[in-house]
């Protein structure tokens, strides 16, 4: 999880101009209970991290979809990518798509296990992405993803 020191360090770097934070507060209480972290450039806003202290209906939607979309429109950002995970994205008007990530394992036995397992996991994920996109109630021009 991202710690307070992460945000303190982030605020002291030049990268902060590319970071947008959306915080959520309960009505009448001036205490942050949830937050989403997005990264931006001149044309794109990417949702990348979210967390909350409380489980409140629609808090995730507000912090990760509604507020970032509203901000992107107000700031003339052309594209919004809400981030990885979840077949729930189709209900929000987004297609499922793969996201790349980079990891390094310093434990060699673990590295070996993950290298063996990863192609199988990637195939299962692409199958799930294609199945999800077959159910979206709108047209889109993304090509089908290959399992090879």
Language-model segment annotations:
Residues 1-57, 136-148:
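A conserved beta-strand-loop-helix scaffold within acyl/acetyltransferase catalytic domains
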Residues 28, 35-37, 70, 92-95, ...:
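Homeobox/homeodomain signature
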Residues 79, 85-148:
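Terminal substrate-recognition subdomain of acyl/acetyltransferases
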Residues 42-104, 108:
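Acyl-donor binding region in acyl/amide transferases
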């Amino acid at each position: 999880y991202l710690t307070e020191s992460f945000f303190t360090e982030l605020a002291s770097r030049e990268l902060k101009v590319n970071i947008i934070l959306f915080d959520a507060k309960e009505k009448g209480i001036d205490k942050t209970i949830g937050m989403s972290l997005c990264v931006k450039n001149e044309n794109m806003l990417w949702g990348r991290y979210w967390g909350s202290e409380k489980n409140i209906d629609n808090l995730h939607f507000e912090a990760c979809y509604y507020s970032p979309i509203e901000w992107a429109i107000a700031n003339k950002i052309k594209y919004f990518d809400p981030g990885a995970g979840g077949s729930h994205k189709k209900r929000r008007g987004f297609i499922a798509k793969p996201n790349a990530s980079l990891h390094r394992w310093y434990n060699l036995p673990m590295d070996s296990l993950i290298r063996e397992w990863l192609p199988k996991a990637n195939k299962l994920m692409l199958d799930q992405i294609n199945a999800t996109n077959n159910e979206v109630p709108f047209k889109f021009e993304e090509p089908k993803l290959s399992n090879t």
